[in-house]
């Protein structure tokens, strides 16, 4: 049985004892139409007028986190551990086995957005879960071994370290300057322009100043909102779909494998990001991160300490802008 264990030196949590199993039968894609029996029952489906699904969500075949598990928090001397309570869902993004995100129509992307938002809102009702995040891996170098386009939804009893770090640093900035850190970053990036890949009325796509991967790009709202799931205005949703699809058409010309993450505010902020003086909605700012995985870092291997990349964000932004979208 898998469980969560806390590293006392870094305060990070790891899942131990997890053994993923291969999905489906030999030669069959479990996510393709007609193979629904190879997956758990659907939690939610969007269906067309013909009665066929075109977006489908179900519990992961080999979940990292499980709803039926108890928290069961325990201490072993100096060490802390707990059950891997949570949820792990798969969203099959469309019926096509070979369609990549750069090929999506705007309407297909909007339906996918709707499913993301529905599942985040639903899972956040469970008070055991402190964070619900959505991510997508494409390509084996990104850790995906089923080619059929799909995303993951993870609801966890602890806030992931990257989200926790963002919450802590955005709160610190807000307390010092009474402004949102990402709002300030967006304003500076637009003024300078050198790392901007594309821009529309409501969003900007940038290669971040301290990129961890070659051609890493973020899509950030030009307005302040902590919660991706709050995005309901249809004009704004169309702008998000347009800039994401434009960016993915550029990135897929340069990278065969990538991860997409939607960073939305946690339900319960980490301790250092919480206080009566300021609410997380004031300082956290949701955004999407696209992390290409094709490229090797230099010989320095302490990837948990420093990321070393071969191209500057400014060069990456120029290269992405040169790609046809």
Model-derived segments and their meaning:
Residues 1-148, 154-226, 235, 249-251, ...:
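Active-site microenvironments that recognize anionic phosphate/pyrophosphate groups
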Residues 115, 242-243:
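Short, glycine/acidic-rich beta->alpha junctions
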Residues 229, 233-242:
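Gly/Ser/Thr-rich active-site loops/lids in small-molecule metabolic enzymes
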Residues 244, 248:
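An acidic, glycine-/histidine-flanked metal-binding catalytic module
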